[in-house]
Amino acid sequence: MKVYLDNAATTPIASEVIEEIQPYLNNYFGNPSSTHAFGRKTKNAIEINRKKIADLIQAKNNEIIFTSGGTEADNMALRCAVFDLNVKRIITTKIEHHAVLHTAECLRDQENVEIIFLATDHNGNPDLVQLESILNDKVNTLVTLMHANNEISTLLPIKKVASICAKHKHVYFHSDTVQTMGHYTFNLSETPIDFLTCSAHKLHGPKGVGFLYVNQKISLNPLITGCLLYTSDAADDLWC
């Protein structure tokens, strides 16, 4: 008998998830942008599940943007922070997921964004004293620190980091929560986080599905253009 012990990399789809999505593979295939019955059925399912996700993390419906997974969500958070929020500096660590590290490096090379890597201890904990010291200037900054490291399992004190960042109006906080979403209780009505990312395949969902939480105080432009967009709320404006 084979035993699978790599859930930190990906998980099998739960049977109840397969049962839930099966009708939308066979029968309810309408384009959610269409106004006919097939489209309305699909659009309604999207909005119902957007609300379920928002309720799970104590967020608002229009703060949930569906993506193709964690990599797109991380890219959207970092790139839109630079392009739309005028971020000039990214603070992170050298042990982040490549979706964050490689995107930050691209923004450094292409947009001249400064990257500062926080020191980490032998357990992978970032130096938060160093973080506080750096943030004392007035440079528009994105702090991006993963909640749980996918290689060594170090857990970030996310509420403490959020509190540090919230002291500075020029600072935005993004956390890659791909490893902890569904396992950790988030209350975004109380914790001042600007961006969170999630990928369904890490919590027994399908591959190719994820979301980005964007605090409603932030206005972003679409990262990917070229398709008919919903216009009912801010989240739909960014979803294709």
Regions found by a protein language model. Name each.
Residues 1-232:
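Pyridoxal 5′-phosphate
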Residues 230-240:
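Single conserved hydrophobic/aromatic residue that forms the stacking wall/gate
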